Every structure is written in C-alpha cells, then in structure tokens.
Design a protein with these regions (language model features):
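Glycine-rich phosphate/oxyanion-binding loops and their immediately adjacent helices
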Residues: 4-11
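Nucleotide/phosphate-binding catalytic cleft detector across ATP-hydrolyzing
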Residues: 12-174, 182-240, 247
Length: 249
C-alpha cells in the first residue's frame, strides 16, 4: 500500500499512457550501474556505481566510469569500491556523495536552487530500514521529495505496460546485485521475490573458473568484460536447415 501511494504521487495517466507526473528525476540506483532519467529529456546518464577515494584523507578521487577503470589498478592509498551490495546501501556516506554527484551531473549545478523531486527504485522485498537508508541518502543529496518504487514496477512502467489493468504481468529484472521477479496487477505487485544472485555473482564465477581451470588470476573489471563478450547466446546457436535441429555449442 505504501508503495502504491508513492506511485500515485509520481505517475499519472495521460492519453492512456502512464507518464511521470510530479517527479523531476527518476533514478535506478543499481549495484552495478546507476541511471538517471530527467523529465522531458529521457535517460541522461548511465554510469557504473563505483567510487574511488583516498583512504588516507577520505577524499573522493573519481566517481562513475572513471572510478570503474581504476578497479584493481590503484595504488595502496586509493580504493575503488561499489557502495551498494545486492541492491542495498553498504556505505551510506559514499552513496550519498555518489548520488549528489550524479544528480548534479545530470541536471546541472543550478538544481541546488530548485531542489528536484526524485523517485528511486529499490529491489523487491527490501526491509523498511533499507528503504529508509535510500530515502535519507537521496534527501541528503539534495532532493525535495523522495518516492521509493520497487524495481519490477519501475521496469514494467519503463516497458510501457499499463500496471493498473486488472491482469497479471510477470516482470523479471536481472541487475548487478539482485534478480527481481514480480507479477504486477492493479497498480502493484501481487507476488514478488528478490534473489540475491545476479551480474556480480556471474563476474565472481568467471574469476573462480579462470583460477581453477587455467590457474590465472583476473580482476573484477576483466571478469566483467569476459561476461559481456560471452553473454550473448545468439552467436552460439546453430540451426540445421533440413532437420530444423537446434544445437547449442
């Protein structure tokens, strides 16, 4: 019910479509990457959820893509981390600074004079404490109002599905930290589950395989690149024309 009330404040019907109403900014605060949607402009920013900082001075060195390139390649005093784990905040202070940076980058420095309304999506079945942490971090980053939306609902709206119709729509949203599954009807999830197995676990599996099979130690960034390159199954499918037999290499 709380989530549905939040949706009512954020979205409205316009010519049979669901559109963002009162929120100025929509944020997909993902474990692996963050997307920022600005009303009237669409998705204006997509960058990795990575922050590099100097642990001697606690000063932020880089955020986003620049920080991702530092993963596994920094001197001892520079640490590149992901401040979110399995879809929830693991480092509140770093997440707050990261959010502030991305909001400012997406809409410009002038947003401090007109604080935006922001909707943020979170995994299904997160606790109230975890939701509150996201809400507080977003307010601290400069939001005037914050609405929390579950990721499958946000994915359904993004796909153009009318979530208020009296029919079931099954949504599977595989992210970096969680895989969220929900059946949505009449404005909200009827049943949902959040599995803490997703893209980051695939990366770790690649690292373990390379170490076990080839006695080769690779880093997180290389593992992600391998995952992306081998992640498309289309090139691995062969169809025999006479028999229509499907063979997967």
């Amino acid at each position: 019910p709380e989530m549905s009330r939040g949706l009512g404040d954020v979205y409205k019907r316009q010519e049979g479509r669901l559109v963002m109403a009162s929120a100025d900014i929509g944020i997909d605060l993902g474990t692996a990457s963050i997307l920022v949607y600005v009303k009237g402009k669409g998705v204006v920013l997509k960058e990795p959820s990575v922050v590099a900082y100097d642990r001697d001075t606690n000063k932020i060195v880089a955020i986003g893509e620049e920080a991702r390139l530092m993963l596994g390649r920094t001197p001892g005093n520079i640490v590149a981390i992901r401040p979110l784990r399995q879809g929830v905040i693991s480092d509140y202070t770093i997440t707050e600074k990261m959010l502030k940076y991305f909001i400012q980058k997406a809409v410009g420095r002038s947003y401090f004079g007109r604080r935006p309304r922001i909707s943020v999506c979170v995994p299904s079945q997160v606790t109230e404490v975890e939701k509150k942490a996201v809400e507080d971090a977003t307010y601290a980053a400069g939001a005037r109002d914050v609405s929390i939306i579950e990721e499958p609902v946000a994915a359904a709206i993004g796909a153009g599905i009318d979530i208020y119709r009296p029919c079931g729509n099954m949504i599977v949203d595989i992210g970096g930290g969680t895989a969220d599954i929900a059946v949505i009807s009449l404005g909200g999830p009827v049943v949902s589950a959040s599995i803490k197995v997703a893209g980051d676990d695939f990366d770790e599996a690649v690292v373990r395989f390379m170490r076990k099979k080839h006695n080769l130690l690779i880093g997180e960034r290389t593992a992600e690149e391998i995952k992306i390159k081998i992640g498309t199954c289309l090139s691995l499918i062969h169809i025999s024309e006479p028999t229509r037999h499907l063979r997967i290499s």
